[in-house]
From Swiss-Prot:
Subunit architecture: Part of a tripartite efflux system composed of MdtA, MdtB and MdtC. MdtB forms a heteromultimer with MdtC.
Similarity field: Belongs to the resistance-nodulation-cell division (RND) (TC 2.A.6) family. MdtB subfamily.
Transmembrane annotation, as ranges: 25-45, 347-367, 369-389, 396-416, 440-460, 472-492, 537-557, 869-889, 890-910, 911-931, 968-988, 998-1018
Protein name per the record: Multidrug resistance protein MdtB
Membrane topology: Multi-pass membrane protein
GO cellular component terms given for this protein: plasma membrane
Keywords attached to this entry: Cell inner membrane, Cell membrane, Membrane, Transmembrane, Transmembrane helix, Transport
MF terms (GO), sorted A to Z: xenobiotic transmembrane transporter activity
Record Gene3D superfamilies: Multidrug efflux transporter AcrB pore domain, Multidrug efflux transporter AcrB pore domain like, Multidrug efflux transporter AcrB TolC docking domain, DN and DC subdomains, Multidrug efflux transporter AcrB transmembrane domain
InterPro entries: AcrB_DN_DC_subdom, Acrflvin-R, Multidrug-R_MdtB
HAMAP family xref list: MdtB (MF_01423)
Gene: mdtB
Length: 1040
């Protein structure tokens, strides 16, 4: 047994140094736990930060936006408005469709929200129209969240109506049962139905009306209970042929007798097998298709959900005819996996670069192996804690681990360097390990807890940004904490067993050259430091100038919210004149599709026209453009968007709005562009007055581009003005008028056909082919008192006027949303400020309110909290350092290094043309924790020299700077190289990672140069200040 020299206690490391087997087994257990934990970690693009969101859709075919608002949306909103935990309620009421989107507080569980929504729908049932075809349907999905998967179902042989029937029952229902799927929608509107198109002239000639025929059809097709017979011995169930299943059966239906002869439905109408809604259509690459969009539930694991769907697809498609093809057009998980793979590669590259730096400085394989073991062990051990906390492998947690490679190696470097120094002086490895580890233990603890203190404010950030970065902060903190444990246990134990004087002194030509280079660098630094200490006020002026410069740069740098990602999918809205019909929109989308599919970067395209829960108005179309992978195309998504908009711009009568899909979705409605701003009023009249004025003002701002509004009040409407007195005299009620109009022009669902697998509808309408437009109203006839038919024109006049195409509400008040993008050369911060200035210039009345929405609102909140976040990080670190050093002064000396990091980060971002967004701000906060390490290592050794060797402060800090120069340079370069792969990232999701790397590399480069000189000067300044205070207050000195 070795005899240990006095004082070689080893501190907290002693037990682990003296018991190598136990230490090895403990570390092996941690490694095994991490490996097992990694296998259970789900993969995602970002941490799950979705607001609990529920969408309620109510369809009422034929109803105008006014009717949908007053009869359907308003009663539902009144009930929903009473729910607790509701954050925001928005609605869209358009022709035949009402969509209410409910966004709840982040803290409310989605299941609880679902129960409240169901209760509210039940309470509103008696307030809704009695002839609603279906009750309101809710789904746990955010409509603004892009589909996780889009599938196109096409066939050259089978009609689309039959295809939808098969897909709905055999495919869509099964996919909707997959865990994590929130909603499966079939875009295309080809749901099978029997369509009855009345011939107005024929029914008028026979003295019939549409209401008579509707009543006859409804009475002829029933499916109700009939009872049973219960005899002494047998029970018999009653059944009848009360159901009609095919168009041919309806065609033969007798609807009346005239002069003793039967009048069959086929005599007065065209009866055919068709689609339930003839004003809906979808296309995949210009071919008619049923487009299946799969959306996930908020909080669901997107990778696991997509994998489950892909596994069951082969089995589901086998149940379809061979002529029916199912094609996966887009799968968001493809890019998510690619992004995660790229980040994992950057993590491995960062580890390799860090180990290379260690070898370059230590030039010794055993000494390089020790931290080379500590880095992966600390990172892998973090996985075990991540599983326990329900985290995932995503871009942010992997970024945290990549950055952590530079952090976790710092502790090991500091320990190894200190132990090596004693071994080189001639002490035995075990004694050197105990002495070096004991001496450096407090420094390791100071470094660790002061760095974790910087991350604490991130945990208390509010709303969605705080939830987003919680996994990042905790993952990084856990890795740093494990690193400290490894550095105080495994690292000194390995040093005691693997290092020796012979191994450390063994040098080759490369080692000797590096040693001479380092010696010259240290000598040059020593000469420069001596000059700086002789001219302290000049150095202090530089330090003060960096503080002022950092404030100035903070003010002028362009500010953004979240990097715009290239995920390979573009969402689009095609806008046409407000009076556009379905047929004209279908033709326009074909022209647009032709241009888009010619672009070399486009892989596939889906388009949708018509009004349903996803598309609010008939004059708009939805597009999803799927791009080729980044490896197969030369341009990024923004360049592709510009090229597509240029190609479509020459098509008359259309405006195309495009935006790339993002992993982070905060909005609750699909918008035309990236950012939204709302104008809310108490009445529609006030909204119609101010909306055009604000739109014109916003369109004139250079800070905004592609400004548009969803306020559309120039749709054409036929106003039927009934003379109530004349109608009453003839025995015609307003209900008769509404029914006649609904029967003719509402695609009215009048009956249900029940099959073994599904239910289909019978649709009633007038055949308007011979009399299109307003002329079709001349064919409407009603039944009078005497049983005769009376034309509508006898009791009503028809006028054409303008009407809103949709009526939108925000928290029950009328609202319009302005969508905009930010042109090149401006930032989101510039755009927000310009909008606020315009609002003040217009002097809006008190009953008109404005508000940013979605990511713009989150940007405002984040921008307001950023300064406080940085202040909180600095204060938290000051408190921790003050407690550790038992001093009010020394923490200030350490924190004086921070402005240099801010200057470097902000300058680097501006040079790179990057905005100061949330990711970059996180990088600056991390820099606060990194750059103070230099000061801590200097001050720790200076204080120890003053205390133990009785050195003067100037000599102590000068010696500490020279002694710690090499570990300071090593740790800074390790942190810099850990961030370098992020800065140089070019793969999928690089937009998300690059700002963090740029901020950290820039901050580290500038701070490394400046703090080596400013910290000693500031240390001596505060030392003199402390002596001055003690001289002025002798009592304090005596107490000391």
């Amino acid at each position: 047994m070795q005899v240990l020299p006095p004082g070689s206690t080893g501190g907290p490391s002693r037990l682990f140094i003296l018991r190598p087997v136990a230490t090895t087994l403990l570390m092996a257990a941690m490694l095994l736990a991490g490996i097992i934990g990694y296998r259970f970690l789900p993969v995602a693009a970002l941490p799950e930060v979705d607001y609990p969101t529920i969408q309620v859709v109510t369809l009422y075919p034929g109803a105008s936006p006014d009717v949908m608002t007053s009869a359907v949306t308003a009663p539902l909103e009144r009930q929903f408005g009473q729910m607790s935990g509701l954050k925001q309620m928005s609605s869209q009421s358009s022709g035949g469709a009402s969509v209410v989107t409910l966004q709840f507080q982040l803290t409310l569980p989605l299941d609880v929200a679902e129960q409240e929504v169901q209760a509210a729908i039940n309470a509103a049932t008696n307030l809704l129209p009695s002839d609603l075809p279906n009750p309101p349907i809710y789904s746990k999905v955010n409509p603004a969240d892009p589909p996780i998967m889009t599938l196109a179902v096409t066939s050259n042989a089978v009609p689309m109506t039959q295809v939808e029937g098969m897909v709905e029952t055999r495919v869509a229902q099964k996919i909707s049962q997959v865990s994590g799927v929130g909603l499966v929608t079939l875009a295309g509107g080809q749901r099978p139905a029997v369509r009855v198109k009345l011939n107005a002239q024929a029914i008028a000639a026979l003295g019939l009306t549409s209401e008579t025929i509707r009543t006859a059809i409804t009475g002829a097709n029933v499916n109700s209970a009939k009872g049973s017979l219960d005899g002494p011995e047998r029970a018999v169930t009653l059944s009848a042929n009360d159901q009609m299943q095919s168009a041919d059966e309806y065609r033969r239906l007798i609807i009346a007798y005239k002069n003793g002869a039967p009048v069959r439905l086929g005599d007065v109408a065209t009866v055919e097998q068709g689609a339930e809604n003839s004003w809906l259509g979808a296309w995949a690459n210009k071919a008619p298709a049923i487009v299946m969009n799969v959306q996930r539930q908020p909080g669901a694991n997107i990778i696991a959900t997509a994998d489950s769907i892909r596994q069951m697809l082969p089995q589901l498609t086998e149940s379809l005819p061979k002529s029916v093809k199912v094609t996966v057009l887009s799968d968001r998980t493809t890019n998510i996996r690619a992004s995660v793979r790229d980040t994992q590669f950057e993590l491995m590259l960062a580890i390799a670069l860090v180990v290379m730096i260690i070898y370059l400085f230590l030039r010794n394989i055993p000494a390089t192996i020790i931290p080379g073991v500590a880095v992966p062990l600390s990172l892998i051990g973090t996985f075990a804690v991540m599983v326990f906390l329900d985290f995932s492998i995503n871009n942010l947690t992997l970024m945290a681990l990549t950055i952590a490679t530079g952090f976790v190696v710092d502790d090991a470097i500091v320990v190894i360097e200190n132990i090596s120094r004693y071994i080189e002086k001639g002490e035995k490895p075990l004694a050197a390990a105990l002495k070096g580890a004991g001496e450096i233990g407090f420094t390791i603890i100071s470094l660790t807890f002061s760095l974790i203190a910087v991350l604490i404010p991130l945990l208390f950030m509010g709303d969605i940004v705080g939830r987003l970065f919680r996994e990042f902060a905790v993952t990084l903190a856990v890795a740093i904490l494990i690193s400290a444990v490894v550095s105080l246990t495994l690292t000194p134990m390995m040093c005691a067993r693997m290092l020796s004087q012979q191994s450390l002194r063994k040098q080759n030509r490369f080692s000797r050259a590096c040693e001479r280079l380092f010696d010259r660098v240290i000598a040059s630094y020593g000469r420069g430091l001596a000059k700086v200490l002789n001219h302290p006020w000049l150095t202090l002026s530089v330090a003060f100038a960096t503080l002022l410069l950092s404030v100035m740069l903070w003010i002028v740098i362009p500010k953004g919210f979240f990097p715009v990602q290239d995920n390979g999918i573009i969402q689009g809205t095609l806008q046409a004149p407000q009076s556009s019909s379905y047929a004209s929109m279908a033709q326009r989308q074909h022209q647009v599709a032709e241009r888009i599919l010619q672009d070399p970067a486009v892989q596939s395209l889906t388009t949708f026209v018509g009004v349903d829960g996803a598309n609010p108005t008939l004059n708009s179309a939805r597009l999803q453009i799927n791009l080729k992978s980044l490896d197969e195309r030369d341009d990024r998504v923004q360049q592709v968007i510009s090229r597509l908009q240029t190609a479509v711009a020459t098509i008359p009568g259309v405006a195309l709005y495009l935006q790339p899909t993002q992993d982070l979705t905060i909005d609750t409605q699909v918008s035309r562009t990236q950012y939204q701003f709302t104008l809310r009023a108490t009445t529609l009249d006030a909204l119609s007055h101010w909306a055009p004025k604000l739109l014109n003002a916003l369109q004139s701002l250079p800070q905004l581009s592609e400004v548009s509004s969803d306020w559309q009040d120039r749709g054409l409407a036929a106003w039927v003005n009934v003379d109530r007195d004349s109608a009453s005299r003839l025995g015609i009620s307003m209900a008769d008028v509404d029914n006649a109009l609904y029967n003719a022009f509402g695609q009215r669902l009048i009956s249900t056909i029940y099959t073994q697998a599904n239910q289909y509808r019978v649709v009633l309408e007038h055949n308007t082919a011979n009399k299109p437009g307003l002329a079709a109203l001349e064919t409407i006839r009603l039944t009078g008192n005497d049983g005769g038919t009376i034309p509508l024109s006898a009791i009503a006049s028809i006028k054409q006027r303008f009407t809103p195409l949709s009526i939108n509400h925000l928290d029950q008040f009328p609202v319009t949303t302005f969508s905009f993008n930010v042109p090149e050369g401006y930032s989101l911060g510039d755009a927000v400020q310009a909008i606020l200035n315009t609002e003040r210039t217009l002097a809006l009345p008190a009953d008109i309110t404005t508000q940013f929405q979605g990511s713009t609102l989150a940007f405002q909140a984040a921008l307001g909290n950023t300064v406080w976040l940085i202040v909180a990080a600095v204060v938290a670190m000051y408190i921790v350092l003050g407690v550790l050093y038992e001093s009010f002064i020394h923490p200030i000396t350490i924190l004086s290094t921070l402005p240099t990091a801010g200057v470097g980060a902000l300058l680097a971002l501006m040079i790179a043309g990057s905005e100061l967004d949330i990711i970059a701000i996180i990088g600056i906060i991390l820099l606060i924790g990194i750059v103070k390490k230099n000061a801590i290592m200097m001050i720790d050794f200076a204080l120890a020299a003053e205390r133990e060797q009785g050195m003067y402060p100037r000599d102590a800090i000068f010696q500490a700077c020279l002694l710690r120069f090499r570990p300071i340079l090593m740790t800074t370069l390790a942190a810099l190289l850990g961030a370098l792969p992020l800065m140089l990232s070019t793969g999928v999701g690089a937009e998300l990672r690059r700002p963090l790397g740029i901020a950290m590399v820039g901050g580290l480069l500038v701070s490394q140069i400046l703090t080596l000189f400013t910290t000693p000067v500031i240390y001596l300044l505060f030392d003199r200040l402390s002596l001055y205070v003690k001289s002025r207050f002798p009592r304090h000195k005596e107490e000391a």
